[in-house]
Curated annotation (Swiss-Prot):
This is UPF0235 protein VV1_1522. PANTHER family: UPF0235 PROTEIN C15ORF40. NCBIfam families: DUF167 family protein, PRK05090.1. Pfam families: DUF167. GO terms for cellular component: cytoplasm. Belongs to the UPF0235 family.
């Protein structure tokens, strides 16, 4: 099985499955070998990606410019890198 979340130096890399247009922003848990995250933004004109980077920045206590979508810009399956996070959410720590 592939890794869901791992450390790469001082960065955290996450494999995500995104559920857009949800009623609230939340980490839902594991979805196969990915971490499922519900976001309120619709998957239109990059709004979901923008919302995701802002949300991950908030959860990891970094600027949104330090959150990079490495793979999956146009799909629900994404690989995201958070550069030098100041905090790691408990849901992520549990599977790290």
């Amino acid at each position: 099985m592939s890794q869901t979340v791992w450390l790469d130096g001082e960065d955290v890399v996450l494999r995500l499955y995104i559920q857009p247009k949800a009623s609230r922003d939340k980490i839902l848990g594991l979805h196969g070998d990915e971490l499922k995250i519900a976001i309120t933004a619709p998957p239109v004109d990059g709004k979901a990606n923008g919302h995701l980077t802002k949300l991950l920045g908030k959860w990891f206590k970094v600027a949104k410019s330090l959150v990079t979508i490495e793979k999956g810009e146009l799909g629900r399956h994404k690989q995201v890198r958070v550069h030098t996070p100041q905090q790691i959410p408990d849901e992520v720590k549990a599977i790290l």
